[in-house]
A protein has these predicted regions:
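Residue-level detector of functional hotspots within protein domains
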Residues: 8, 40-42
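Bacterial Sec-dependent N-terminal signal peptides
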Residues: 19-40
Length: 256
C-alpha cells in the first residue's frame, strides 16, 4: 500500500508539470512584448511645417510639401521605435494614400516619399511595436474619442496595412502570424457589428490585412492563382459577396 504522502507528492508534481506545460504553450502562442506608448502630443520631435501653416501656404509644388515632411537624418536614427511609429501615423500627407486607384499604389507612394516609414520598417522590433499598438486600439464607440471621424477610421486602415506589410510580416514567427490574424479577426467582427460607422472601404482594409498575413510569403507575394482574389488584394475594387465569402473561409481554415 502506497504511503498517502507519496500520493500527495505525486499530485503536487503532476500539478507543477501541468503548470509548466501550460506556461510553455502560452509563451509559444504569444511572445510579443507588451509596449507602452508616449503621449502623441509630447513626442521628442514633430513636423515643423504642417498643412494650414503660413509656411505651408507658400509651397508651390507637392515636392516642396514632401521635402518639408522628411525627418532630419540626425534625428531619425535616434528616435525610439515607439515614437517613430507615432510620428509615421502623424505624417501630414498621409491622406495622399487614398488618392490612388489601387490601395497598394497608395502605400507604395507613402513608402517611397517618406523616410520615416522606411526607417520604421527596418527596425528589428517594428512588428512588436505595431502589434502592441494595434491591440490597444479601441473600436467600440464608448472607448474611441475619435470614433466617428474619417481620420480615426482611416488611421485604423493604415495601421492594418502596416501590420501586414512584407517588411513586418518577415519579422513574425509562425505563432505570431496566427496571433496577429486572430487580433485582426477580432477587430473585423467589431467593425461588422457597427457597420454603419465603418464604411465598406474600411472593412476591406482588415480583410486585405488578413489575406496578406495568411497567404503572403516574406517577400509580400500573394500565393494564389485566383485572379479576382489577387485584384481584390491589390485594392482595385470593393469585393463582391463571393470574394468576401472566399476570404472568410480562408480565415476560418487558417485559424481553426
Amino acid at each position: 500500500m502506497k504511503n498517502p504522502f507519496q500520493k500527495i507528492n505525486l499530485l503536487i508534481l503532476f500539478a507543477v508539470l501541468l503548470f509548466s506545460a501550460c506556461k510553455k504553450d502560452s509563451q509559444e502562442i504569444s511572445d510579443f512584448e507588451y509596449i507602452g506608448f508616449p503621449n502623441e502630443n509630447e513626442l521628442s520631435w514633430d513636423y515643423p511645417t504642417k498643412p494650414g501653416s503660413d509656411k505651408w501656404k507658400t509651397f508651390q509644388s507637392h515636392n516642396e510639401m514632401l521635402e518639408a515632411c522628411q525627418i532630419p537624418s540626425t534625428i531619425l536614427t535616434n528616435l525610439s521605435t515607439e515614437e517613430l511609429f507615432l510620428i509615421c501615423l502623424k505624417y501630414p500627407l498621409l491622406m495622399d494614400i487614398s488618392a490612388f486607384n489601387f490601395v497598394t499604389d497608395g502605400y507604395a507612394s507613402y513608402e517611397t516619399n517618406f523616410n520615416g516609414i522606411r526607417e520604421f520598417y527596418q527596425r528589428s522590433n517594428a512588428s512588436s511595436v505595431i502589434y502592441s499598438y494595434y491591440q490597444q486600439v479601441k473600436l467600440e464607440k464608448n472607448n474611441a474619442t475619435l470614433y466617428s471621424t474619417i481620420s480615426f477610421v482611416f488611421r485604423v486602415s493604415v495601421i492594418e496595412y502596416m501590420i501586414s506589410v512584407s517588411p513586418v510580416i518577415s519579422k513574425y514567427s509562425t505563432t505570431q502570424r496566427k496571433e496577429v490574424a486572430t487580433e485582426l479577426l477580432s477587430k473585423l467582427n467589431i467593425k461588422k457589428s457597427q457597420k454603419g460607422d465603418f464604411p465598406e472601404t474600411y472593412l476591406n482594409s482588415t480583410y486585405r490585412a488578413l489575406i496578406r498575413i495568411i497567404r503572403c510569403d516574406e517577400a509580400g507575394t500573394l500565393s494564389t492563382d485566383d485572379t479576382k482574389l489577387a485584384n481584390y488584394f491589390a485594392g482595385g475594387f470593393s469585393a463582391p459577396e463571393s470574394i468576401i465569402a472566399q476570404v472568410d473561409e480562408i480565415i476560418r481554415q487558417y485559424l481553426k
